[in-house]
Amino acid sequence: MTHWPSPAKLNLFLYITGQRADGYHTLQTLFQFLDYGDTLHIEPRRDGEIHLLTPVNGVENEDNLIVRAARLLMKAASESGRLPAGSGADISIEKRLPMGGGLGGGSSNAATVLVALNHLWQCGLSIDELATLGLTLGADVPVFVRGHAAFAEGVGEILTPVNPPEKWYLVAHPGVSIPTPVIFKDPQLPRNTPKRSIDTLLKCEFSNDCEVIARKRFREVDAALSWLLEYAPSRLTGTGACVFAEFDTESCARQVLEQAPEWLNAFVAKGVNLSPLHRELL
C-alpha cells in the first residue's frame, strides 16, 4: 500500500476578465497549495482492474474523478504502448476536504491519481502529458499535476509558475456547498475586470470577484467572512464556499481558530508553493 497527498489549494485572488462565446469565463487567478488535504491510499493490482474502495456519498464510482482519472491514464498509456500488462489499482481515500468548498478537492484527487499511477505503473508519461490529460477532467487539475504555485489565465489552463509569500491561513467552511455554475451564471457577477500583468497584480490588494455573489446568495458565507474580517485580511477561495484569513505566523492563526464559532468547520494550514504531492516524489 502506498500513500499519496492530495492537497487543497487557495485562490489568493480571482478576477473575471470576460466571457467567451462558448459560455466559459476568462479569468486571472493565483493558485497556492496548502500543507493540508486528502490522502489517497493506492495498492497496485496485476489484473487490470480499477477499484475505488471508499465510495463518495451521492457519486457513482464510475463518475468519481478518482476512477475517471485512473481510466484516462490507463487508456492514454495503453494507446501509446506504455502501459505494462495487467496494470490496475485498489484506491481508497481519507477525505478531509469538503465538496463544493472551493479548495479543489476533486481536482486534486484526480491529479494525485494521474501522478501516482504514472509512477507506480511506470508508464513514463511526462508532466506535460499528464497535465493535458488532467485538463479534460477539469480546469483546475493541471495546476495540481504540475505541482507549483501558479498564476493562471485563459479559463485557468494557462499557467505561469510563481512564488508568492508562504503565509499561514485559517480556512473556514461555513456549512454550505456552492456549485460553481450558481456563481458563474449569476447576472450580477463582474465579468469585465481589466486584465493586468502578474507583477501589477502581486502589488495590489488581493480580492475575489466571486465573493460579492457568494455573500449575497449564501448568508452562511457572509457570516463567516464577517467574523474572519474582524481578525485579519480575509476572502473567498474559488467560487466558495470556503473562506480564509491570512496570518504571518501559525500562532496568530491558531489563536483566532480557538475563538471560532461552533457552526464553522475551520482549520489552520500553511501556504506552500511546492505541492506536498510533488515533495513525495523528490
Curated annotation (Swiss-Prot):
Pathway: Isoprenoid biosynthesis; isopentenyl diphosphate biosynthesis via DXP pathway; isopentenyl diphosphate from 1-deoxy-D-xylulose 5-phosphate: step 3/6. GO terms for molecular function: 4-(cytidine 5'-diphospho)-2-C-methyl-D-erythritol kinase activity; ATP binding. One of its GO terms (biological process) is terpenoid biosynthetic process. Pfam families: GHMP_kinases_C (PF08544), GHMP_kinases_N (PF00288). ATP binds at residues 98-108. It catalyses: 4-CDP-2-C-methyl-D-erythritol + ATP = 4-CDP-2-C-methyl-D-erythritol 2-phosphate + ADP + H(+). The keyword Kinase applies. Keywords: ATP-binding, Isoprene biosynthesis, Kinase, Nucleotide-binding, Transferase. Catalyzes the phosphorylation of the position 2 hydroxy group of 4-diphosphocytidyl-2C-methyl-D-erythritol. HAMAP family: IspE (MF_00061). Homodimer. This is 4-diphosphocytidyl-2-C-methyl-D-erythritol kinase. It comes from Salmonella agona (strain SL483). The lineage of its organism: Bacteria, Pseudomonadati, Pseudomonadota, Gammaproteobacteria, Enterobacterales. The gene is ispE.
